[in-house]
């Protein structure tokens, strides 16, 4: 009898230990060209950054749209996307939510010897634009031009395309300026091209002083509520990994192959831009600023970008508790 009790007790002890050691698996969809891959690589490479309460399952996605499909179908738990999309989904009853990842957005870039020195100088010029007519950088740049009495859409010859193709357009002198996402703009700057204005400068020109994150982690609120400790631990570890990449040359050296370039100047510019994009402040002021940006984008896109909701949906932003 005693041996049976001992055996049962031993089994219960082993089961409890196994349960306690069980980690939450976080399935995250990652684009090969994105900077999130750098951060996750650093996180997984350093034993000190590996918390005991989660493990990552990284699933490659071809592009942003593929990531959205994977998230909505339940193939992954998290992707990186923008809060405008999250708000539009919540307006339809979905329970997705957003936690900030980066303050970086886009930049307006010209050749170093270009006569273009301001937005007004774009009049009559050829402009390459990453994305489409509803790209947020493009909409906000038009809003800033309107403040200077310039109808930018009517004043330039527009070429829309994928970010790498837009960079090729300016290299081949097929356009006079490009509006591209930050890491593609950084590659041009490292090769001698000149920045006219970046996303933060555009927002400041529109009266938004706060740094508002352009992209972040997107996931189901219900899923996060069930795995609160693990997801909050993941966000904390991600910030620590970013800090390591920005302060440790040894850590940065390990992710250099992920930059997909052998050019040291480009590598340096990418690291600088990545580190400048860290989210240091995310509170009520920044979220109120996001609501003002939402209102602008709703008007500028004639509801096409935001959907019919007049304001940013409650619950769009996830709060660590």
Model-inferred region functions:
Residues 224-301:
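Secondary-structure end/capping motifs
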Residues 83-84, 164-256:
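Pocket-lining segment of extracytoplasmic ligand-binding domains
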Residues 98-118, 210-221, 225:
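Hydrophobic/proline-rich hinge and linker segments of small-molecule sensing/allosteric domains
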Residues 54, 72-81, 93-96, 125-126, ...:
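Alpha-to-beta junction loops
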Residues 23-47, 107-110, 115, 119-187, ...:
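Bilobed "Venus flytrap"/periplasmic-binding protein-like clamshell domains
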Residues 55-63, 80, 152-162:
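Short beta-strand-to-loop elements that line the ligand-binding cleft
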Residues 26-28, 93-101, 126-130, 204-209:
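A structural signal for short loop-to-beta-strand junctions that line the ligand-binding cleft
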Residues 291-321:
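Conserved C-terminal helix/tail region of periplasmic/extracytoplasmic solute-binding proteins
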């Amino acid at each position: 009898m005693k041996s049976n009790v001992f055996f049962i007790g031993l089994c219960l002890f082993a089961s409890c230990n196994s349960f306690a050691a069980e980690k939450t698996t976080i399935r995250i969809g990652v684009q090969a060209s994105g900077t999130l891959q750098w951060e996750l690589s650093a996180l997984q490479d350093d034993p000190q950054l590996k918390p005991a309460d989660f493990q990552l399952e990284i699933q490659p996605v071809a592009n942003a749209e593929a990531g959205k499909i994977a998230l909505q179908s339940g193939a992954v738990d998290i992707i990186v996307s923008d809060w405008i999309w999250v708000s539009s989904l919540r307006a339809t009853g979905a329970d997705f939510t957003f936690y900030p990842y980066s303050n970086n957005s886009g930049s307006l870039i010209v050749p170093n010897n270009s006569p273009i020195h301001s937005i007004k100088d774009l009049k009559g010029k050829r402009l390459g634009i990453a994305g489409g007519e509803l790209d947020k950088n493009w909409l906000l740049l038009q809003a800033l031009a309107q403040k200077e009495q310039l109808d930018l859409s009517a004043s330039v010859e527009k070429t829309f395309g994928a970010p790498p193709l837009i960079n090729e357009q300016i290299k081949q002198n097929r356009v006079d300026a490009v509006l591209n996402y930050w890491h593609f703009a950084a590659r041009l700057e490292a090769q001698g091209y000149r920045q006219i204005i970046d996303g933060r400068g555009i927002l400041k020109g529109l009266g938004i002083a706060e740094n508002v994150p352009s992209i972040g982690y997107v996931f189901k609120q219900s899923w996060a509520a069930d795995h609160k400790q693990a997801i909050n631990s993941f966000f904390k570890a991600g910030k620590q990994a970013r800090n390591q990449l920005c302060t440790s040359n040894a850590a940065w050296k390990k992710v250099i192959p992920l930059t997909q370039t052998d050019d040291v100047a480009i590598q340096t510019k990418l690291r600088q831009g990545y580190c400048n994009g860290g989210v240091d402040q995310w509170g009520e002021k920044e979220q109120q600023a996001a609501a003002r940006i939402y209102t602008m984008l709703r008007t500028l896109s004639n509801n096409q970008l935001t959907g019919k909701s007049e304001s940013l949906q409650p619950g769009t932003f996830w709060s660590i508790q």
